[in-house]
Every structure is written in C-alpha cells, then in structure tokens.
Curated annotation (Swiss-Prot):
This is Alkaline phosphatase D. Residues 339-359 are annotated as: Disordered. PANTHER family: ALKALINE PHOSPHATASE FAMILY PROTEIN (AFU_ORTHOLOGUE AFUA_5G03860) (PTHR43606:SF2), PHOSPHATASE, PUTATIVE (AFU_ORTHOLOGUE AFUA_6G08710)-RELATED (PTHR43606). It comes from the Bacteria. Residues 1-56 form the signal peptide. Residues 350-359 have a biased composition (Basic and acidic residues). Keywords: Hydrolase, Signal, Stress response. Pfam families: PhoD, PhoD_N. Transmembrane segments: none annotated. Its EC number is 3.1.3.1.
Amino acid sequence: MAYDSRFDEWVQKLKEESFQNNTFDRRKFIQGAGKIAGLSLGLTIAQSVGAFEVNAAPNFSSYPFTLGVASGDPLSDSVVLWTRLAPDPLNGGGMPKQAVPVKWEVAKDEHFRKIVRKGTEMAKPSLAHSVHVEADGLEPNKVYYYRFKTGHELSPVGKTKTLPAPGANVPQMTFAFASCQQYEHGYYTAYKHMAKEKLDLVFHLGDYIYEYGPNEYVSKTGNVRTHNSAEIITLQDYRNRHAQYRSDANLKAAHAAFPWVVTWDDHEVENNYANKIPEKGQSVEAFVLRRAAAYQAYYEHMPLRISSLPNGPDMQLYRHFTYGNLASFNVLDTRQYRDDQANNDGNKPPSDESRNPNRTLLGKEQEQWLFNNLGSSTAHWNVLAQQIFFAKWNFGTSASPIYSMDSWDGYPAQRERVINFIKSKNLNNVVVLTGDVHASWASNLHVDFEKTSSKIFGAEFVGTSITSGGNGADKRADTDQILKENPHIQFFNDYRGYVRCTVTPHQWKADYRVMPFVTEPGAAISTRASFVYQKDQTGLRKVSSTTIQGGVKQSDEVEEDRFFSHNKAHEKQMIKKRAKITN
C-alpha cells in the first residue's frame, strides 16, 4: 500500500489555518491526526506515517496488556475505553519507538456475539503507547463489554455502562468512591471487594499514586510493599510509578468492572503543592517541568477524554456529569488553580492571611463554572466530587482552634462564596464527596457552622483511604475531642476501605465499607455504618452500625500524625538531595 499523502496535506492545511488565526487547536489536530492515521493501517511494517513510524504487525517480547483495561468519563451515548501496551511495564513499558495499531470492540454481551462498535486506534510512543478510545453511538443507561487486540494478542474483557439520557427519570443509582492508595502501606483488598459490588459508576477522588521513594513515607503499622524507584521527578519516573500501581491485580479488576470518573489531589505530583508552588527545596522552574511530566503520565494512565489532554504543565480536569434527572456531579480540581497555603501550610490557627477574602481554592473560572452548574441544575441532587475536607473541622479546642491550611478551612472565603451561592438558590440537596484524610467522616453542612441551628443545605461524606496510613483503628485518641468541638460532624472511623452510595430522588444513603487490616491480604469487608440524608432539615441519620471484628479498637494516633509523617518523608527526601549535591 502506498503512503497516503493526505496526512501531510492535512497537517500543512492545519498549520496554515493556525498561522492565519494565530491559534492552534490541539483537539482538532489530535482528532484529525487519528482519522488520517486510521487510513494507514494497511501500511507495511515500520512504514512512516507523518512524524512517527507505524508497526502494523507487532511482535511483543511478552504480553502487552499487563496494565489491564479501563473505561471512564461515561456519557449517555459514549464512554472512554483505555489500555496501554506495556510488555515491560516497570521499565518504561518495553515498547519500540513506533506507533502500533490497536483494534477495539464494544459488544452488548461478554462473548462478543453482538458487536455494536469497533475500530482501530494508534498507540503512540508520545503517550507511552496508551490508548484512549471515545466510543460513541451507544445507547443510554446500557451495560457494554469491550476489549482490545494488537498483533496476535487479546486484552482482558472490560465491562462498562453509559449514563442515562439527560433529564431522564431515574429511580436509583449505586456507586462507590475511593481515594488515597499508597502502595507501600498495604494491599488493595478493598478493590477486590469493590469489583464484586453491583455499581453503576466509581469515582476516584485523588492520590492515585504517591511520589515518594522507598520507605520515605512510612505508616504507623509499617510498610509492606516497596516503591520501585527513588522519588519520582521525570516523565519516565511517573510512568513507571503509575505502571507499578496499575499492575496490582485487584486494582485492575475494579477498573475492568465499572466505568470510573477520576480526579487528582496532590500526590499525583507531590505533597501539598499549590498551583505552580512546590514543597520547599526546589525551584518553581524545576517544579513546572515536574508538574508537566506528572500531568502527562496521569493522562496516559487514566480513561480520560481528549479534552483533558495536557498542555504543558496545564490540564483541564474539572468536568460535569449528569445522571438523568437524579444527580448532577461537579468533579472539582482543588489543586491546579489554588493560592498558596496560608501560614506556611500545615495545621495552624486561623490568621489574617487565611481569612483574606480574595483567596481562591478553585480559581475564578472553575468557581464560575461551578456556580453556573449549580444555578441551572434541575437534578434531585447536586454533588461536589472533590478532594479535601469541606466542612469546618477544628482539631484544636474552642479557645485555641487548629485547622488544616491545605483544606477548605485554609480558604474560608472560598467556602463562604460557595455556601452563599447555595444559600441564594435555596438549595438543600448538596452532597460533597471527599477523600484525602485517610479516615471516614460524615458531616451535616450548615450555612453557618458556628450555629448548628442554622439551615442544613446538605451532607459531606468523607471516604477513608484504600491503604494510606496502614491498618488504622475503629477510633483514634483524638476522636472524642474532635466530635465534641465539631457538633456538625456525626461520624468518624479510621479503618480502610471505600464508600458505597445508593441514591434515589428523595434519599441519599452512604455505606462505609471498611476492613480491619491492609498489611496482609485477605481481609473481610463490612459496613461499619450507614447514614441517610433526606433533604428534610433533620440532617444525617445513622440507620445501621456494626462492630468490625479483628481490628484495633482504639489507636494512640491523632490527626496531626498524618502531617508529621509527610514532614518526615520530606526531610528524608531533602537529606538525599543534599547528599547528592555534596557528592
């Protein structure tokens, strides 16, 4: 087959249009390039296609689908299908610097007798041979099965589901949300259990990977696995770390079982970074390069649409999903646009700096986007799927309050603007989903947290970690004091797991699914407690509670231990960097 000259002609035409308009449309370029490349699947081995070579008949050193398959960002008529070719996943992937065609199929049945969509996508070295197929033309609220093929190799089969049509009457949905899965701190048994649930969707709220070198961040119950490299800095580093996490069988099973909607927190790049401001010990210029590498690796390993393709150190990740008329999900990015943490970060008393009315956590554009979505929503529930503690959370005393400068408490003016907007629209159906803090919490959301008699406009469900922090316990040494100082907080638990939510038009039920340990595989899972919120001003109501067998009843840990552990990890990193410089 002769080389198809339309590719070069199309690229030249796009360049001319871009120069004339003084703009460059990345999305148009990528979509167009994919279409033109698709014309060339019959090329001979290693024949050139534009700027890259295509290996149309690949032979692999070992099985290329080592990282499994995933789906995500579902809409009512489409879903993203993901995989990455990586026969040697922990050493850069083990692929040649050639593009490889990957066939994909979507079927109504798991035996692929009723195939409804199929095509070919190019796995390119520029994106670590990852594939992001936006499979469209699908029916609303339907289960589908998908798979990939390249050369003579066939991927595992994944199962996914489209969203109901916008505005459709939906009687119920069930989903889970998870966060914080430090690989060294434990085994991903929670995902083994999650994969067996009957779910429509999974949300991941951040800290999908951790950036630390081996045994820099150590849990109270000890590290039981080891990171595969020193602190990650470069694109290759981040790719290998994602691959290590993605190689876990339980995580792969959960990805293959349901569509996921993901957002990041800080450890996908580094601890507590704010916008383009890093931790101490590195320049802004070096950090911007690091952030760009981290963002690209994140995109390469997540089932995201091309609208989220990074542009250097920037990436569009906040987005909106509607589940019929039942729920409107606003997936936030509280990391990329925020002002620097006040008071030099950490857990501190409030100050003039933290109270500055101009401080932002979301950035102006995202804040306005959120208000537009909340203001126009006609859904039964308005959801903020995000990273950090939203409710006021004093873990000091009334006389000497202490707040996390990294959470919404460090940006009270931003929280007040959100609450004031909710108040102006007279909403009482707001649910905030949160990760980050490695423990389970449940809070009533008041228009004024200082007055528990003030209107309740919603509830916050904070999910515990998958592994981060180690085994945990039923309660901590500071639990009773925190609950006393924060009467709007109704529940705390420190075991590991995830949250399962069952939603109907009139009721939101959250089940806290936890395990007694993660430092060994095989832990059983139980529902520690279930809470219901019903939009009737009575707030959260506990409807069940269970004692977890086989775990620690109370630990000597307190909230600030998590902050101290990260500080110790950073100190270890700085010692290594100083030693490297002096040597």
